Amino acid sequence: MAYNYNMHTSSRVAIIGAGVSGLAAAKHLARHHPQVFEASDSIGGVWRKCTYETTKLQSVRVSYELSDFLWPNRGESSFPTYVDVLDYLEAYAKHFNLVKFIKFNSKVVELRFIGDGKTLQMGDLGAYGNLLPGKPVWEVAVNTGDGDIQWHAFEYVVVCAGKYGDVPRTPTFPVKKGPEIFKGKVLHSMDYSKLQKEKASQLLHGKKVAVIGFKKSAIDLALESALANQGKEGKTCTMVVRTPHWVIPHYWRATVSKFIESYVLWKLPLEKYGLKPDHAFEEDYASCQMALVPEKFFEEADKGMIRFKRTTNWWFYDEGIEFEDGTTLEADVVILATGYDGMKKLKAIVPEPFRSWLEFPWGIMPLYRGTIHPLIPNMGFIGYVQSSSNLKSSELHSRWLSQLLDGKFTLPSKEKMLDQFLKEMHVMRRSSRFFKNHCFSTFSIQHADDLSKDMNLKP
C-alpha cells in the first residue's frame, strides 16, 4: 500500500463520519468549510449499515427531528422506517448543501498528533489550550480504497465515527464449545444487516433461529425471523436472554414516574414470558438501556413464533446451543445481537498517549459537556454520549462546539472539566448499576441548560 505524504490543508477542521452526528457537526461548522471523511459511499451511518427490514425509529417523527429541518408529514403518528430516516437525513444534507464537504469512500485509519511536540502528561491539568491555533495540530491518514493512503493536516478534528457498527462485540466460549463445532450458521447482527432483503429472508425462512440478546437489534431480528416464518413451513425463533431490561410499548410517550413499572407490566406480557427485569425501571432509564417493542412482537410470541430462554451462560454443540442447566436448543441459524465495540474502533486510530486516556477513569470516555475530552487537545467528540434523544443531543453538542470554536466562550481548566464529568458519573452510579454508558437521561434538562448557559442562550 502506497503512502502519500503530501499534506492536504484545504480546511482547518476535519470531521470523521457522515452519520447523524457528522451531518449535524458539518452543518454547524459550515463557516469553517470542514472536510468530512466518510468511509462508505453514502451518508446515514448506522441507519445505512446496521438496519434490518423491520427496523423502525423508536419514536414518532416530531421526537426525532433537527430543530431547523422539520419532517414532511410530521403530524403522522406512525413510526418512520429506516428508509424514511435515511430519506430525511439525505434531504437535510441537500437542504444545507453539506455534501460538498464530504469525501466518500475515505476511511480514516490513523491520527497523528503534531501539536507542540511535547509529550502530554496526565498531571498537566492547566488550561486546555488554543482551539484554532493557526497551524496544524493533527495529521489524518485516509484510505481512499485505491491502495493509496493520503495524509491531511488540520487544526481541529471532530470525531463522529459512532459507537455502533464496524466492530462487533462477540461472546467468548470454553475450549471446543465455540461456533467452530456448530453445524449450522453463526453470524453477528452486523453481518445480517449487510444482506439483501431476499437473501436475508432465505436465511431465516424454514429455519430454527436463535437470537442472542434482548436489546433493540435482538428484538427487531426476532420479529423479522417470525415474520419470515409464517405458514406451515415456518419455524420458531428463540431469544436467548441473559439480563432482561425494561422494554416499552411502541405507543409509549416519554415519561417516568413511580407508576411506570405497573403500566408497562399491564401493557406488555413480561411476567408471562419470564422477562420481568430484576431491577427497577428507573435503573434502565438512567443508563439508556431501554428498548421499544415493535408492533406485532408479542403478537408473534403469543402465536408461538417467538420464544424466550433465560440463562446466564451458554455454549455451542454440534446441533445448536447448550445451556448451563443442561438443556439444549436445536438451531439452524444463530444470530449474535451482542452489540458493538465502539471504543475498540476509536482506539484503532487514536495514538498514544491519548489512546490510554480514552476510557479514564471508569471505562467511560470523560467528555465535558458530552463533547470535549479534557486530556486530548484540539479534538471534539459528537455522538459518544446517550440520552433520551441522541439526535437532539448531537445537534445541541454540535451547536455548542461551533460556538466554542468561534470563541463565543472559553473552556474551564482541565481539572474543572474532569471534576464535572466525575460528578455526572457519581449521579449515574447512584441511579443505576448499568453505568457503562455515558447517559444523560436523568439529568438531560440540566445538561441542556448548562450548554445553553455556555452559549448565552435562554434554556
UniProtKB/Swiss-Prot annotation:
GO terms for molecular function: flavin adenine dinucleotide binding; N,N-dimethylaniline monooxygenase activity; NADP binding. NADP(+) binds at S217, A218, I219, D220. Keywords: FAD, Flavoprotein, Monooxygenase, NADP, Oxidoreductase. Its cofactor is FAD. SUPFAM superfamilies: FAD/NAD(P)-binding domain. It holds the Pfam family FMO-like. InterPro entries: FAD/NAD-bd_sf, Flavin_mOase, Flavin_mOase-like, FMO-like. Its EC number is 1.14.13.-. It is an enzyme of class 1 (oxidoreductase). Belongs to the FMO family. PANTHER family: DIMETHYLANILINE MONOOXYGENASE. This is Putative flavin-containing monooxygenase 2. It comes from Arabidopsis thaliana.
